[in-house]
Swiss-Prot record:
Key word Cytoplasm present: yes
Any one biological process term the GO annotation gives: regulation of establishment of cell polarity
Lineage, opening ranks: Eukaryota, Metazoa, Chordata, Craniata, Vertebrata
GO molecular function list: actin binding; guanyl-nucleotide exchange factor activity; small GTPase binding
Keyword Transcription regulation: no
Composition bias, Polar residues: 1-10, 431-442, 1020-1029
Gene source species: Homo sapiens (Human)
The encoding gene: PLEKHG3
Region of interest: Disordered: 1-66, 431-599, 613-708, 756-780, 821-840, 859-878, 955-1133, 1146-1207
Sites bearing Omega-N-methylarginine, chain numbering: 1107
Protein name according to UniProt: Pleckstrin homology domain-containing family G member 3
Protein location: Cytoplasm, Cytoskeleton
Length: 1219
């Protein structure tokens, strides 16, 4: 395809590289359908003049202005402006660039109209030709793109060639470019659908006839590619404006912001496309993998690299797949991969060889035999692999490594390209393991490099302002000079500025660069021209892209007839360029959809946005998102979960930007927007738009969109919309399939990456300005929000909900709320159902902000710290906690988007007084909680039985509260005394000692004590965490099952048998002993025995044997009684070992036996026999059935006790029969 005609130059002014003929407009250039007639008469002298020519010598030469005059007449309401305006030679350089932007946009809109009117509507009007699903897959949401760009063209036409107004048009509509993401996601489906159509004779004939009738030299596939190419070029077009715009003039910041915005859009689309390719490749690897016994590969995160290497001492080559969480080693066998091993990145160790520059070794640091000495093909390939392996080792390390330390380690690596140094990819990767680490410890330190980078940029601007004579070239060179010396020279060459390239003399084209490679390969060209060789360097491609193609790519020769096969194969090659290079063992970094320089610029922009985007802005955006505004009316009917939501792109920069929001803004948001726009001449550091761009703050987005489209366009869009709605009416699943075709990217990797984007820490919050004050300069919510991807809660059902505004609180508030929760948790009478004290659900993730750093420690139930529940704690923190709880409730109940009033002076004073005392203890508490939770997850060791003489009383009484889970096991993961010893279980001798200490006067029972207590029998192999004396609620390990066995309530049985003994003694005249009391001095609140009288007790000690066996428990036999006056003692009536090695011991109090009887009991022939046991249990049951309920405050479900006793008897019968 030829480039546009070359124009002469005016004096010393240099003619820019022509932007008229572009990839996006080449179709219309060849199709005789443009509404604009180029002033060719003024160009004729230039072709024969002596000026510097920029014409391109390419095979296709039919793309001059004389061959594409209007044939069908005007097709757009905007074509009346086509020939308007002065000739090119009368315009300044900047004016010509602006004109080029407007005219290329006009031709692009004509191409879109051709797709919608000449293809899509004709298919709709031809019933039976294609099914609605095929139509949706083929065209995607092209009608929405046509509507958006028609409005954008209308805005550009009204700018009167004002560059600031042109730039502001892109800023205002940046929220609506998310529909391009949907289109790009659907583009592979479009290629597949068109290929399938061309296999059908009737459908292929229809498309050929339409092409011939419309006199299009290019097929439909070329037109469907144009939106993908166009959206990736806007930022390059705007860069031409910035290069020739005076930095000191008003509106330069608007131009810069437009560049940033459209670069972010391009980067976002490129990143989503790359993820889609990797996800498809990941599924392909999964299907080709043999002998893999592990989980689905999507659980290991994103596919980072793949390659085939020679391995030392291995005959055949090995293919390595590097994922975010593991390194997979396979052997290629035909088209399949045979699994040979894998090393988790958390256990991966890298050894770089100093002798051989191509070799490096990866090994499992715990298993040295699992070692692979890899030989790369090139030094660049080795550096690429070792760099990413180092990064993943740091990110997956069990310890929390500060972000600055990670960056310092990676910067020491010789391979640390600028693309990764300041790119959004690094921001995402920096927290790739936050989902795992956040449950153990707080998040890493806030990254501060973006701020330094922004300061460097400001200093650079100051230097450029002081040296105006040297122009932009010096600024570009100074920017390049900031690159580290250790980086490869190719990365520096990638940053070659456009101006330095465009100032070169006429450059002969490279025959292999006939089409643009790094954006999307054109679908018709031969593969030799479409795919560059592996040895071709990126800077050569970029030079060709800038110097030869004039910022925009070009189509291949138009005489290619056989386009179907090329489209189905070459496009897919273009979509998987990274995989092709990696499989081929390419030395360079995998290609992307954008040139390296574009990604470098996008990375710089990302860093600037992170430093300037405040936490307050992010909260306001979340509020606005929850209020539901920001979705354009003409966006696709099935909005993409991966699209750039308008509400996430921040507030508008000036008054006209509120047009797209005012339809659905809530009153509160309207107030906040008014404060930001009405009282300040510039918002976020931006100057107001030039008068050349009309500002209409009173018109809603709906009215504006309706007026921007002509009646004919509205009829077209309504017809297409009704077609899809009718299809949805006949097929309920059509809407779901259409939405998936527009927005679906396989889960696995993209889901993890999106959650990482959402877990990015917010920068330091700015002070809340009072009403009427100016907004802080430097905040750029509109453009930064392009990086905020939708959360996993939107993409996948069942994921945790997004972080709400109420959780963004300073650390002091969270600390005091914790103290209030702990104090209320330790108070008597608190039932187990009060899990949502202070408005916090204890089973929801707990978000902790440490010095404005968002960290999350998630447990299955909140675990309080022992320090906070100690009885020596003063009243002041609790009082402050109550005050701050009220404050938090007040803040959380405030309306969205409303500015919060200043805090009460007393609260502020208390906060300052207590913050210094609490901060250190809070940090220790956080670390302790993290360690405990980590130990609980990692520890699978059983509880060791304690020797009889080692029992210690470890805690005082618990405010009279009876235990909720009186199981005699402590958690296996809790160390004793800080030395790693396990807390042992209670032995029989200990039980005797504890009961000997029980003698206290009667004490009225509280409501909590009157309620029956349940014994939980946990049959799992993992120990159950019990309630500690400090008042910590029980939290089972995530590994333990939840099924339990409810034992009878001992207190119920005690009271019933005590009443029976009382009646018996009343009949026999025996004196009564003191009443039964509850112990408050032992850890597990064991019951005390009476001094006299017969009180039957039945308690089970469910013990888990340690690794050395559970032989520490004593053998069955009578226990010596500490109070022999009553003539009674305790007997072990049953001692059974269950199938899961748990030991059940049943003890009963009885009369003191004779020595002979004692010998019989010790040998197992006395009352401990099964017959005696059954008789005693039956006696218990009969007595329980005869006794009525004692107190109404107790659990009314007394009949259930009978069933429990009966079940207990049947269980013992079954166990004895088995034994």
């Amino acid at each position: 395809m030829p480039v546009s005609t070359s124009l002469h130059q005016d004096g010393s002014q240099e003619r820019p590289v022509s932007l008229t003929s572009t990839t996006s407009s080449s179709g219309s250039s060849c199709d005789s359908r443009s509404a604009m007639e180029e002033p060719s008469s003024s160009e004729a002298p230039a072709k024969n003049g002596a000026g510097s020519l920029r014409s391109r010598h390419l095979p296709n030469s039919n793309n001059n202005s004389s061959s594409w005059l209007n044939v069908k007449g005007p097709l757009s309401p905007f074509n009346s402006r086509a020939a308007a305006g002065p000739a090119h030679h009368k315009l300044s350089y900047l004016g010509r660039v602006v004109r080029e932007i407007v005219e290329t946009e006009r031709m692009y809109v004509q191409d879109l109209r051709s797709i919608v009117e000449d293809y899509l509507l004709k298919i709709i009007d031809t019933p039976g030709l294609l099914k609605p699903e095929q139509v949706s897959a083929l065209f995607g949401n092209i009608e929405n793109i046509y509507a958006l760009n028609s409005q954008l063209l209308r805005d550009l036409d009204s700018c009167n060639s004002d560059p600031v107004a042109v730039a502001s048009c892109f800023v205002e509509r940046s929220q609506e470019f998310d529909i391009y993401t949907q289109y790009c996601n659907n583009y592979p489906n479009s290629v597949a659908a068109l290929t399938e159509c061309m296999r059908d004779k009737q459908q292929a004939k229809f498309f050929r006839d339409r092409q011939e009738l419309l006199q299009h030299s290019l097929p439909l596939g070329s037109y469907l590619l144009k939106p993908v190419q166009r959206i990736l070029k806007y930022h390059l077009l705007l860069q031409e404006i910035a290069k020739h715009f005076d930095e000191e003039e008003d509106g330069f910041e608007v131009v810069e912001d437009a560049i940033d915005t459209m670069t972010c859009v391009a980067w976002y689309i490129n990143d989503m496309k790359r993820r889609h390719e990797h996800a498809v490749r990941l599924q392909e690897i999964q299907s080709l993998l043999i002998n893999w016994k592990g989980p689905d590969l999507t659980t290991y995160g994103e596919l980072v690299l793949e390659g085939t290497f020679r391995v030392h001492r291995v005959r055949n080559e090995r293919t390595f797949f590097l994922f975010d969480k593991t390194l997979l080693i396979t052997k290629k066998r035909g088209d399949h991969f045979v699994y040979k091993g894998n090393i988790p990145c958390s256990s991966l160790m890298l050894i770089e060889s100093t002798r051989d520059s191509l070799c490096f070794t990866v090994t499992h640091y715990k298993h040295s035999k699992q070692q692979y000495s890899i030989q790369a093909k090139t030094v660049e390939e080795k550096r690429n692999w070792t760099h990413h392996i180092k990064r993943l080792i740091l990110e997956n390390h069990h310890a929390t490594i500060p972000q600055k330390a990670k960056e310092a380690i990676l910067e020491m690596d010789s391979y640390y390209p600028n693309r990764y140094r300041c790119s959004p990819e690094r921001l995402k990767k920096a927290w790739s393991s936050q989902d795992e680490v956040s449950t153990n410890v707080r998040q890493g330190r806030r990254q501060s490099e973006p701020t330094k980078h922004l300061l460097r940029q400001l200093n650079e601007k100051a230097r450029a302002a002081g040296m105006k004579g040297k122009g932009r070239r010096e600024s570009e060179s100074s920017r390049s000079s900031r690159r580290p010396s250790g980086r490869s020279p190719t990365s520096t060459e990638k940053r070659m500025s456009f101006e330095s390239i465009s100032s070169l003399p006429e450059v002969e084209p490279d025959p292999e660069a006939g089409s643009e490679q790094e954006v999307f390969s054109a679908v018709e060209g031969p593969s030799a021209e479409e795919t560059p060789s592996d040895t071709e360097s990126p800077e050569v491609l970029e030079t060709q892209l800038d110097a030869h193609q004039g910022l925009l790519g070009m189509d291949p020769p138009g005489d290619m007839v056989d386009f179907v096969a090329a489209e189905s194969t070459e496009d897919l090659k273009a979509l998987s360029s990274e995989e092709e290079e990696e499989m081929g063992g390419a030395a360079q970094e995998p290609e992307s959809l954008l040139p390296p320089s574009v990604l470098d610029q996008a990375s710089v922009i990302a860093e600037r946005f992170v430093s300037s985007f405040s936490r307050r802005s992010s909260v306001a955006q979340e509020d606005s998102k929850s209020s539901g505004f920001g979705s354009p009316r003409l966006v696709s009917r099935s909005s993409s979960v991966l699209s750039l939501e308008g509400s996430e792109k921040g507030l508008a920069r000036h008054g006209s930007a509120t047009d797209s929001l005012s339809c659905q803004l809530s009153p509160e948001v309207d107030i906040s927007v008014g404060v930001a726009t009405e009282d300040s001449p510039s918002v976020n550091g931006m100057e107001p738009p030039s008068p050349g761009c009309p500002v209409e703050p009173d018109r809603s987005s709906c009215k504006k969109k309706e007026s921007a489209l002509s009646t004919r366009d509205r009829l077209l869009l309504d017809k297409i919309k009704s077609y899809y709605e009718n299809a949805e009416h006949h097929d309920a699943g059509f809407s779901v399939r259409r939405r998936e075709s527009l927005s679906y990217i396989p889960k696995g990797l993209v889901r993890n990456s999106i959650s990482r984007f959402n877990s990015l820490p917010r920068p330091d919050p700015e002070p809340v300005p009072p009403v009427g004050s100016k907004r802080q300069v430097g905040s750029r919510p509109t453009s930064w929000a392009l990086f905020e991807l939708p959360g996993p809660s939107q993409a996948v059902k069942g994921d945790p909900p997004p972080i709400s505004d109420a959780e963004f609180r300073p650390s002091s508030e969270i600390v005091k709320i914790w103290e209030g929760m702990e104090s209320s948790g330790g108070s008597p009478g608190k039932g187990p159902g009060q899990g949502q004290a202070n408005g916090f659900d204890l089973h929801e993730p707990l978000f902790i902000l440490e010095e404005h750093e968002l960290g999350a420690i998630t447990e299955e139930s909140a675990t309080a710290s022992p320090e906070s529940s100690s009885p020596t704690e003063g009243r002041s923190p609790a009082h402050l906690a109550r005050e701050l709880k009220e404050l938090v409730k007040e803040l959380s109940s405030s309306t969205q988007g409303e500015l919060v009033a200043p805090l009460h002076p007393r609260i502020v004073q208390l906060s300052h007084v207590m913050d210094s005392h609490v901060s250190e203890r809070v940090k220790n508490k956080v670390y302790q909680l993290a360690r405990q939770y980590s130990l609980r997850i990692k520890s699978n060791k059983p509880v060791m039985a304690r020797p009889p003489l080692q029992w210690e009383k470890v805690a005082p009484e618990r405010d009279g509260k009876s235990p909720t889970v009186p199981c005699l096991q402590e958690e296996a993961g809790e160390p004793l005394g800080g030395k790693g010893k396990r807390k042992p279980v209670l032995s029989l001798f200990d039980y005797e000692q504890l009961m000997a200490q029980e003698h206290s006067p009667p004490k009225p029972s509280s409501a909590g004590e009157m309620s029956p207590q349940r014994f939980f029998f946990n049959p799992s192999a993992v120990s159950q965490r019990t309630t500690s004396p400090g008042g910590r609620p029980s939290a089972r390990s995530p590994l333990s099952p939840t099924e339990t066995f409810s034992w009878p309530d001992v207190r119920e049985l005690c009271s019933k048998y005590a009443s029976r003994d009382e009646a018996r003694r009343a009949g026999g005249g025996r004196p009564r002993g003191p009443p039964v009391n509850r112990s408050h001095s032992v850890p597990e609140n064991m019951v005390e025995p009476p001094l006299s009288g017969r009180v039957g007790r039945c308690r089970s000690l469910s013990t888990k044997r340690g690794r050395g066996g559970g032989e520490a428990a004593q053998s069955p036999g009578p226990l010596p009684q500490s109070k022999p006056d009553g003539g009674e003692t305790l007997y072990v009536t049953a001692d059974l070992t269950l199938e899961d090695n748990r030991r059940v011991i049943v003890m009963e109090k009885g009369p003191l036996p004779s020595p002979t009887a004692g010998l019989e009991e010790s040998s197992g022939q006395g009352p401990s026999s099964p017959v005696a046991l059954l008789g005693q249990v039956q006696d218990f049951q009969q007595s329980a059935e005869c006794q009525p309920k004692e107190e109404g405050s107790r659990d009314p479900a007394d009949p259930s006790q009978q069933g429990r006793v009966r079940n207990l008897r049947e269980k013992f019968q079954a166990l004895n029969s088995v034994g």
